[in-house]
Curated annotation (Swiss-Prot):
One of its GO terms (biological process) is L-methionine salvage from methylthioadenosine. It comes from Streptomyces avermitilis (strain ATCC 31267 / DSM 46492 / JCM 5070 / NBRC 14893 / NCIMB 12804 / NRRL 8165 / MA-4680). This is Enolase-phosphatase E1. It catalyses: 5-methylsulfanyl-2,3-dioxopentyl phosphate + H2O = 1,2-dihydroxy-5-(methylsulfanyl)pent-1-en-3-one + phosphate. Pfam families: Hydrolase. It is an enzyme of class 3 (hydrolase). Belongs to the HAD-like hydrolase superfamily. MasA/MtnC family. It comes from the Bacteria. Monomer. InterPro entries: Enolase-ppase_E1 (IPR023943), HAD-like_sf (IPR036412), HAD_sf (IPR023214). PANTHER family: ENOLASE-PHOSPHATASE E1. HAMAP family: Salvage_MtnC (MF_01681). Keywords: Amino-acid biosynthesis, Hydrolase, Magnesium, Metal-binding, Methionine biosynthesis.
Length: 239
């Protein structure tokens, strides 16, 4: 049964929603580990790298931590699945390089791209909100198996420019940036805590439940749910 929504904007989670968590864990995380060391040494003068390294040192409480110590911390945070902003920033830079070199191609579930194209063609504004950095999101959508999907997406949000994904204030920040009433925004995610935070900010929500994903068995509580994007219908009001 399809859920029908009269909304103006859709905000998408990536991992577990548009794309397989297994791909991120099994492909992207190992790639990050293999490239962190080179990134920290070869691009140490890059302002974005330097800022992220400073944030790592601050989180560690070790202002003099060298590149080896920083790399060790990044890998430990990966092991713990910690959503630390500097980790996500540096991952995004590493992945962007990999996508640009053709060493990486992103993953989307088969039902996702047709839905995104249809919604975009119908005038629905599409945005992304992920714990992955904006740089990583940009590379992800640009390097899909079906080509560059970035033209479909109007805005990219992460934990740095919006805030933590389980805090309602982050969703209010995004709504303000969109200039859209909260009840005209639909958030798609597989994570109950994120869905709860979005709803607390006044957004509409759908929990995307895909077999094999980490939150599939847990469910999404009393949120509307869909097993694929094909189970979500958007019928925008013309009034």
């Amino acid at each position: 049964m399809s859920s029908v929504f009269d909304i103006d904007s859709v905000v998408l989670d990536i991992e577990g929603t548009t794309s397989a968590t297994g791909f991120v864990v099994d492909v992207l995380y190992p790639y990050s580990r293999s490239r962190f060391g080179a990134l920290l040494t070869e691009r140490s003068g890059d302002p974005e790298v330097a800022r992220a390294v400073a944030q790592v040192r601050e989180l560690l409480g070790e202002p003099d931590a060298d590149a080896v110590r920083v790399e060790k911390a990044l890998n430990e945070w990966l092991d713990d699945d910690r959503k630390a902003t500097p980790l996500k920033t540096l991952q995004g830079l590493v992945w962007s390089e990999g996508f640009a070199r053709g060493e990486l191609v992103s993953h989307f579930y088969d039902d996702v791209v047709p839905a995104l194209r249809a919604w975009h063609a119908a005038g629905v504004r599409l945005h992304v909100y992920s714990s992955g950095s904006v740089a990583a999101q940009r590379a992800w959508f640009r390097s899909s198996p079906e080509g560059d999907l970035l033209p479909l997406v109007e805005g990219l949000y992460d934990t740095e420019n919006a805030g933590p994904k389980q805090e309602p204030e982050s969703y209010r920040t995004i709504a303000a940036a969109l200039g859209t009433g909260a009840d005209r925004i639909l958030f798609l995610s597989d994570r109950p805590g994120e869905l709860d935070a979005a709803r607390a900010a006044g957004w509409r929500t759908v929990g995307v439940r895909r077999p094999g994903e980490p939150y599939y068995e847990q469910g999404v509580g009393d949120h509307a749910q869909a097993g694929s994007f094909g189970g979500i219908t958007i019928a925008r009001s013309t009034a």
